[in-house]
Curated annotation (Swiss-Prot):
Transmembrane annotation, as ranges: none
InterPro entries: SmpB, SsrA-bd_prot, SsrA-bd_prot_CS
Pfam families given in the database record: SmpB
Protein name per its UniProtKB record: SsrA-binding protein
Compartment(s): Cytoplasm
One GO term (biological process): trans-translation
Organism: Synechococcus sp. (strain WH7803)
């Protein structure tokens, strides 16, 4: 007798291998995201364990290009609870991001424009690798935020009205 859940288990395995670990929802409210880029991130072992446990906060994070390298600043990854103090990592250390040289050069050219910044949008698993999605964003003014919120509300009401009929 054959097992009946082969496809479900494979789909569940793929979903588990590509799951979202941390999300910066505030960034999409504060910035207009013009372009996104997926990069690798250089981590130590206790950081990987903490991120997989959901102990990462991207809210105050930003990225800079220094000495030709992409660097992630001000992202808090909590110390691993089951590691001793000696072997644990610094929660706010500067982390190196892994991207191709041409991608970094392209970003440097775009960042030279006034008002653009690199913001971490989310951390996710891609197979066994932890990836960081960066967004090239332009800061929104207060009236832009209000207009975006109003547009979002109108679209929501329109969808609800159309679904009733």
């Amino acid at each position: 007798m054959a097992k009946g859940g082969g496809k479900k288990s494979a789909a569940a395995a793929r979903a588990a291998a590509n799951r979202l670990l941390a999300d910066n929802r505030l960034a999409r409210h504060q910035y207009d995201i013009l372009e996104t880029l997926e990069t690798g991130i250089e981590l130590v072992g206790t950081e990987v364990k903490s991120i997989r446990a959901g102990q990462a906060n991207l809210r105050d994070g930003f990225c800079l290009i220094r000495n030709g390298e992409l660097q992630l600043h001000n992202v808090h990854i909590s110390p691993h609870t089951h590691a001793s103090g000696y072997f644990n990592h610094d929660p706010l250390r500067v982390r190196r991001l892994l991207a191709h040289r041409r991608e970094i050069d392209k970003l440097r050219g775009q960042l030279d424009q006034k008002g653009l910044t690199l913001i971490p949008l989310n951390l996710h698993l891609q197979g066994s690798w932890i990836k960081l999605t960066l967004g090239l964003g332009k800061g929104r003014k207060l009236h832009d935020k209000r207009a975006a919120e109003k547009d979002k509300q109108i679209k929501k009401e329109t969808r609800a009205a159309l679904s009733r009929y």
